[in-house]
Amino acid sequence: MIDNGGRFFAMKHGRKIHRLSRPADQRRALLRGLTTQLLKHGRIKTTRAKASAMRKYVDKMITLAKEGSLHKRRQALGFIYEKQIVHALFAEVPERYGDRNGGYTRIIRTLPRRGDNAPMAYIELV
């Protein structure tokens, strides 16, 4: 056993989470904001880590909109910051993504950011 000051840390096999160097509440707020902006504009530029972390939540919101029940709409309203985006999402998504089972976003790598050389990417709705 490894001596690490009396604390034992078990390995987290298969439980990958993108921490993004933030506490849980700030990370959730960041991902909610990025998801809202992507659904509003259709395409945003962000770091690759943030893009891959938010992809899960965007796909979840689109899946909720495809199901379209009142319960799913209220779940989406609890996550997306702007009410108008939720209404537009639930009106537009069933005919746009009706035959697609997942994979609603595309990540396009681009040049690193000039100031700190962070890897950047565009994330867009397919």
From Swiss-Prot:
Signal peptide, first to last residue: none
Asked if the Swiss-Prot or TrEMBL record annotates the protein with the keyword rRNA-binding, the reply is yes
Task: Give the UniProt subcellular location, in the record's own words.
Answer: Plastid, Chloroplast
GO aspect biological process, one term: translation
Which Gene Ontology CC terms are recorded?
A: chloroplast; cytosolic large ribosomal subunit
List keywords of the entry alphabetically. Chloroplast, Plastid, Ribonucleoprotein, Ribosomal protein, RNA-binding, rRNA-binding, Transit peptide
**Chief localisation class:** plastid
Gene3D superfamilies from the UniProt entry: Ribosomal protein L17
MF terms in GO: rRNA binding; structural constituent of ribosome
Q: Where is the transit peptide?
A: 1-10
Query: One Pfam family of this protein, by short name?
Result: Ribosomal_L17
Oligomeric state and interaction partners are given as: Component of the chloroplast large ribosomal subunit (LSU). Mature 70S chloroplast ribosomes of higher plants consist of a small (30S) and a large (50S) subunit. The 30S small subunit contains 1 molecule of ribosomal RNA (16S rRNA) and 24 different proteins. The 50S large subunit contains 3 rRNA molecules (23S, 5S and 4.5S rRNA) and 33 different proteins.
State the family it belongs to: Belongs to the bacterial ribosomal protein bL17 family.
Its biological purpose is as follows: Component of the chloroplast ribosome (chloro-ribosome), a dedicated translation machinery responsible for the synthesis of chloroplast genome-encoded proteins, including proteins of the transcription and translation machinery and components of the photosynthetic apparatus.
The protein's name in its UniProt record: Large ribosomal subunit protein bL17c
Q: Which lineage do the record's taxonomy fields give for this organism?
A: Eukaryota, Viridiplantae, Streptophyta, Embryophyta, Tracheophyta
